[in-house]
Amino acid sequence: MKSDIVVIGGGASGLMAAYSAASSLVKAGKAAQVTVLEKMPRPARKVMITGKGRCNFTNVKEWNDFSSHVRSGVSFVKSSFYNLPPSAVVRFFEDMGMKTVVERGDRAFPVSYHASDVVDALVNACHGAGVKIECEAVVEEVKSIGNGFEVLLQDGGKYLCSKVIIATGGLSYPTTGSTGDGFAWASALGHHIVPTFPSLTALVPKGYKIKETEDIRQSRADADDRFHVDRSTPLSELGEKLCGIQMKNVGLSLYVQDNLVDTDQGDVDFTDGGIEGPLGFRMSRKAVKSIVNGSKVFLVMDLKPGVTLTEITERVKTLWKEVDKDPRSARLREKEKCRILLGKLMPWDLIPAFVEMHREIYTLERRSRTETKLWINLVSIAKALKVWRFDIAGYVGYERAVVTAGGVSTDDVVAKTMESRLVSGLYFCGEVLDVDSDTGGYNLQTAFCTGALAGLNAAKSLK
């Protein structure tokens, strides 16, 4: 089979690349075929689950603000960003009949909050431009031959083409088809692959999962994934107490080898995986990379980031006096009164885990052989509110990581065209590249803009 341009991978970046190539060929009056080879039964499976199915498809920030959320390859992305900025991405979808809405944090969604609308728009745009989408087309190998390429399929078929765009994504959510195939092909063609690791993933605190987690890690002592904790691993009693709690506007600081490396304020979720949410995800990139490199990592959560330790200490003491003097507290034990106090300082469902992890808030005084007195340490409560430490035992792997960090080195790719510096006619776009960003629409924007630039230049270079 022959096709002038073959796009391998029918995800967000691949579909945008195919549309960009085909539509530019139509505008130029060139008769050429663009074909997408997608290994799964349907295209854009990962897009379908983005944002829990709501699909935050871009972030409408201008470059200066947007770029601060790109964690790798920021200078590389700039040209593609200006070629297809977020405003153009929004316009593309609206032109395809999908109404959009922009929410807090400049995050753009389909007004329906259905990811299927995003997928339908991409697929319909491709079909309208004459793109051929072949599903269940599993590529085995990409060969550079003469002035073109030979793309070999698992079923024995092959495509001969002038240009190839590799848009196979990374390793995240492999059930959607992202299994790292593009890394092997790129490497075989001479490209350097920056070591990969999961990013925007759950960090698993020590004691959050069952004790068998430690045994599992020991059995993987020689493996690259020895700190990977499968999300399905059962929760411990502590994990059960924390799971499902969502914290709004807390402080979170990341320490590596006892050195502060990052700090921010925002929302944190405790899930069946561990510590997630927008802020937890943002910290995960540096955390996972450090863990993989053998460093000790811990997080410190500040439940009261708006006040100083001195201020919260005085607040705790004042509240305790109110609780202690309340007639309804007269017959209550100290621990019961402490629970009432904590309920004035944090969500009620957080109290059991907070107490379990901060036993120092109770001081037991032995007055005689038979008499003891329990004291509530108010200073310790205040300190724990400001410094709640979570030692990180591991992380959830690619099976539920939002993106893959690492990939095809951007040193081997021309930023203004997305073409390989090593193999003429070969292009890369999307997550297969060593480019990743924060959660909030940044990664899909990068997928779209790098895909659009790759498709445009692949079409332009056709003779």
Located regions from the model:
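Beta1/beta-strand and adjacent pyrophosphate-binding region of the FAD-binding site
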Residues: 1-13, 35
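A conserved short coil-to-beta-strand element within the FAD-binding core of flavoproteins
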Residues: 135-148
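Short beta-strand to alpha-helix junction loop
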Residues: 77-87, 104-124, 173-177, 205-208, ...
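Residue-level recognition of phosphate/Mg2+-coordinating polar/acidic sites
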Residues: 23, 42, 63-65, 73, ...
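Short hydrophobic core segments
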Residues: 6-8, 37, 139, 158-175, ...
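Glycine-rich loop(s) and the adjacent beta-strand/alpha-helix scaffold that form part
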Residues: 163-215, 228-229
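Conserved N-terminal glycine-rich FAD pyrophosphate-binding loop of Rossmann-like flavoproteins
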Residues: 39-71
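Glycine-rich FAD pyrophosphate-binding loop
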Residues: 6, 22-52
